[in-house]
Structure formats: C-alpha cells, structure tokens
Amino acid sequence: MIAAGRDALAALVAEFLQASLDRRIELTRRFRAGEISKEDLPRDVLISLCLVDDWRHADDVDKIPYVWRQCALFLSGSIKTTSHSLPHVFVHIDEWVKEHPEDRANLTDPEWLHRASAEAFRLHQTTPARFRAALRDVTLTSGRQVKAGEMVALHAPVANVQAEVFGEDGRYFNPRREVPDGMQPWGMTFGLGAHACLGRNLVTGIQNKGDDKHGAQGTAVRILKAMYELGAELDPDNPPRRPEGSLHDTWESVPMILRKA
C-alpha cells in the first residue's frame, strides 16, 4: 500500500506538480527582480514556499522531498474529511429518519444538514490521533507529566464522546444535539488552536454555520443538500458494506439511488 502511494505521488509530481513548481520558482525570481508585482503571483501553497525559500530541505535526498510532502498533505486535507465522512452521514441520516420520520422534511435544510454532518465528524474521525513532540516539560491538568521530547497523542474518539460535553448519549448520532457555548459540535475532530486542521472551513463552512445568512455552507452541506434534492437514499437491495481485513472506521461501499435524477 505504501509503495502504491509513493507511485501515485510520483505520477502526480510528473504530470502536474513539477511543472507548477518550476513556474513558481521563475515567478518568484521575476518578483524579486521587480519585473512583476505580488498581485501577479498565484495564491497557493507552492508560491508561499517559494517566496520564503522553503521548498527544499537538506533531507530531501533521503526521503520524499519536502515540497511534495506539503502538496500531498494539502491535497489529502482538502478531500479526505469529506470523502471519509459523507458515507457515514448518509448512513446515520438513513437510520435517523427511520426512527424520526418528522425530520425527513429537513433533508434539504442547510442548518439541519450542518448539524447532521457535525455529528458524523464527531463520531468518525479520519485521523483518530494526532501526534506531537513536547517542546518542554509540562504537567497536564490531570497531573500527568510529559517530558521534553516525549511523543504525545491527542486521542479524539475518547474526547468526542465525553458526557460532560456531549451528554449521556454522546456515543450516538443525534442532529438535535446541543453543545455548551464555546464548544465545537464536532469536538476535537479538526484539532484546536495552532494544531487545528487548515482545511476545516472548507468542509464546515467559513463561520461554522450551515445557512447562507451566517456564512458559506461548506462542502459537506453543499454535497448533502444537492444529493437529497435529487432524492438520494440508500439502495435497499445493496446495503452499506464495511471493508474486510481492516479496523479503520470507514465504508468500502455505500450504494445510493437518486430517485429524482
């Protein structure tokens, strides 16, 4: 699997990224020479790395070059949460409306879909744990001590079902859930502070709202709304299927029918 991933990245570099990097290196040279203004530069990760001369590192000869690792990170970050979570949302909503048929009328309501997608994000993380190396000795509020250089992991699944925050039914999907002020409805799924996911707003909406009045809806709500407007429902003859030989919290197949397409 790792070899296949490396081959895919190599193909991406050869077909798209190398030419893009070469162009941005040249644009950076022209910008520094005063031939073009900053407004003439594209706004993307590659140009940002070129402008601060951070597109190559000393260890590039020993591993996948730094610049391609950054490109792969942003590509994965821009699509992984959406592609991982939406199947979970569809399955959860199907189960929910069977038990709460009155909510079927909300399937095209952006705010309701925002709540539903937030619940799925909370319950099904693409990356259950985030690892960091401690920069200094620190004592956590629990009293646990972490030494400088020690690796620690933020384990989101446990935090995301804490009864004190999400209620006694926190382990279950509930688009009607209310969370305390200051808490995100998706819990720790996207991280927090300096370690927050850079692509969160792309998925959840700019201001974390699902309605047009308060901000962009985000990719999850837009896709869900478009699908339900086309009469999307799970295929009764082909139920969702989990992957075999893996404990990863994902779906291998979620067949759907668009009744109004």
Q: Where do the language-model regions lie?
A:
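Conserved cytochrome P450 K-helix E-x-x-R motif and the immediately C-terminal K′/meander segment
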Residues: 107-144
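Extended hydrophobic-aromatic, low-complexity segments
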Residues: 129, 149, 162-167, 200
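Buried hydrophobic packing segments
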Residues: 86-93, 117, 155, 207, ...
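Cytochrome P450 catalytic core segment centered on helix I
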Residues: 1-57
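Conserved cytochrome P450 K-helix/beta-meander segment immediately N-terminal to the heme-binding cysteine loop
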Residues: 155-182, 190
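Central I-helix of cytochrome P450 enzymes
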Residues: 13, 17, 47-105
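Cytochrome P450 heme-thiolate "Cys pocket" and heme-binding signature region
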Residues: 177-254
